[in-house]
Amino acid sequence: MFVTAAYAQSSTTEGAEAHDAAAAGEVHTETGVAHEADHGAGVFPPFDTTHFASQLLWLAITFGLFYLLMSKVIIPRIGGILETRHDRIAQDLDEASRLKGEADAAIAAYEQELAGARAKGHSIADTAREAAKAKAKADRDGVEAGLAKKIAAAEARIADIKSKALADVGAIAEETATAVVKQLIGGTVTKAEIAAAFKASAGN
């Protein structure tokens, strides 16, 4: 409706201008002077006040269409893009937070397992050390017991050998004494007398 009214107004204005121009042309034809020479150079159309109404109308229509385009298409699309990016960033942050939590939990579990392994290693080392000490003590006790038995057996054998040697020495001494007496006095002496003499000398 506005376009029709403006167009009608513009047509009426242009018709009036044409009529005036024709009348002026007739006058100027009669006087022999050009129309443009009387009024000067023509006005730049955008600055012509006779076209302000239609220009304002088209400006309002253009602004309205641009506003509708911005509000219905461009701004919602930009808002959707921004919202999508915001959601994606939020999801990435949530994923990063979740991964960080999992990494922290894994590190804590690893440190706990490492501490348990160290404690177990120390316990095994202590147990092995105590077992080695016990085994060494048992081996040492066994060796000492064996040595004690061997020493006792050796001492018994030495005592037996010593007693036998002493017995042999006594017999040899008796035989030697008998031979010496026989050589000295020319008589014979019995073993009993020699033994009695040895016992008497041993008692003194």
Curated annotation (Swiss-Prot):
User: InterPro entries annotated for this entry?
Assistant: ATP_synth_b/b'su_bac/chlpt, ATP_synthase_B_chain
Q: According to its UniProt record, where is this protein mainly located?
A: membrane
- Segments for region (Disordered): 8-28
Question: Among its keywords, does the record have Transport?
Answer: yes
Q: Which GO terms describe its cellular component?
A: plasma membrane; proton-transporting ATP synthase complex
Q: Name one GO molecular function term.
A: proton-transporting ATP synthase activity, rotational mechanism
Taxonomic superkingdom: Bacteria
Pfam families in UniProt: ATP-synt_B
User: Where does the UniProt annotation locate this protein?
Assistant: Cell inner membrane
The residue ranges crossing the membrane are 56-76
What does the UniProt keyword field contain?
Answer: ATP synthesis, Cell inner membrane, Cell membrane, CF(0), Hydrogen ion transport, Ion transport, Membrane, Transmembrane, Transmembrane helix, Transport
Bilayer topology reads: Single-pass membrane protein
Matching NCBIfam families, A to Z? PRK09174.1
Q: What is annotated about its quaternary structure and interactions?
A: F-type ATPases have 2 components, F(1) - the catalytic core - and F(0) - the membrane proton channel. F(1) has five subunits: alpha(3), beta(3), gamma(1), delta(1), epsilon(1). F(0) has three main subunits: a(1), b(2) and c(10-14). The alpha and beta chains form an alternating ring which encloses part of the gamma chain. F(1) is attached to F(0) by a central stalk formed by the gamma and epsilon chains, while a peripheral stalk is formed by the delta and b chains.
Briefly, what is this protein's role?
F(1)F(0) ATP synthase produces ATP from ADP in the presence of a proton or sodium gradient. F-type ATPases consist of two structural domains, F(1) containing the extramembraneous catalytic core and F(0) containing the membrane proton channel, linked together by a central stalk and a peripheral stalk. During catalysis, ATP synthesis in the catalytic domain of F(1) is coupled via a rotary mechanism of the central stalk subunits to proton translocation.
The entry's family comment says: Belongs to the ATPase B chain family.
Q: Which HAMAP family match?
A: ATP_synth_b_bprime
Protein name as annotated:
ATP synthase subunit b 2
